[in-house]
Amino acid sequence: TDKEGASKHIEAGAKRVVISGPTKSDGVDTIVLGANDDKIEGATEVISNASCTTNSLGAVMAILDAEFGVQKSMLTTVHSYTASQAIQDAPKKDPREGRNAAENIVPTSTGAAIAVTKTLPQLEGKFDGISMRVPTPVVSISDVTAVLNKNVTVEELNNAFIKASKEPYYQGILGVSDEPLVSRDYIGNSNSGTVDLELTR
């Protein structure tokens, strides 16, 4: 969806339109819960809620940067396959996306890292990422590697996320887990993202 299409709702009388995904249109603010939702009152009439990956990362990156300072970071998201991919090998602009999504791990780009920097502009130039599309129907996992301004332990990192997850502000946005869960266990989970504490290094 672009600004032009979404603006038709404004012309029809809507006070605000939320694009429930990313947009490349100029003049559309990106608002993500847990990252920059405090700016919603002054945002453009048409706003973007970004992608599922961006929503899962927004609070995580905001907390990492606020608590420890992020110098540089890299994202690898292992993402369930999407409607943009082919179910059998076929020609596409991105040849990898044209390969059978149900039988391949498909490396591709992700706009999530750039979208996170739209919500957390202090991370611009410090955050990049790639995506691996895998043959699962739902749920994705994101692995973030970060160089921080402070030397920290695994316990300190996890405690920052545990503390944040208990704050009223992050309810329904950020969860934590110390259980040995897999993707299927997260189906129906209402958080934007859950930090798997057992995987912190």
Residue ranges and their predicted role:
Residues 1-98, 201:
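N-terminal Rossmann-like NAD(P) cofactor-binding subdomain of oxidoreductases
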Residues 69-72, 77-201:
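C-terminal substrate-binding/catalytic lobe of Rossmann-fold NAD(P)-dependent oxidoreductases
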